[in-house]
Amino acid sequence: MEVLSLSMTSESLGIDSEAYLFSILKGYKKEFPNLISCRQYNDRRKFTRNLCETIRKRMADSIDGGEDYFCIDSKPIEVCRVARGKRCTMGKNDYSKAPSFGYCASQKTHYYGYKLHVLCGLSGVIHSYDLTKASVHDINYLQDIKLTYHDCSIFGDRGYIGKEIQLDLFESANIKLECPYRLNQKDWKPQCLPFARARKRIETDFSQLCDQFMIIRNYAKDTIGLFTRIIGKISAFTILQYVNKLNNRPIGEIKYAMN
């Protein structure tokens, strides 16, 4: 638990580098007489990543566990530049977890790495997420969603449009998938204003994860290390939301949660 506490505190304070964290802790030897080394900290942080996610889920459920409306989106996580992609050694021992080349339609850029899929409630609390290869289509994550969620509505962007997947979600789990129409669709309709406002919530989450938690910055040299960093950042994000709830503050104002 001490490792998790130290990890969550450093992420919440915006300390993104483990080496930098331990350079700071050297000045507090009296407060941390039994402080482990940076290498031991990294190893134990990887070992406790599943426990960290379990605690995060309980906090998320305690904030708005009865949510019936969700937003879904994805975020590119680049591990190196495209030119160095073929020389990247991350995941070389396990191809199923190795990064791949992908394309981000919103940014109109090619990249090499992973894709972070996120499902959050209308209040901004992240309930589910996963990290896949960059080449995996957004729709594939919905196959995992239907195994966990049911009797709810999910708002997605145009990347989730598909009559077959919408019908499958509705018939298998009574999930209603709402997506804006493409301009060239025959049955085109203007986007509903409440739907557009709901979509802004997950975009705000991504902005906060990139700004305060620097989720797109990668120092990891292996796949497990990257996954552990992602889990730690999203867990710290949820903890700050939980702190705001306990203090009767808007849960989205995470920058002021530690004040």
Predicted features, each with a name:
Residues 1-259:
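Short alpha-helical elements
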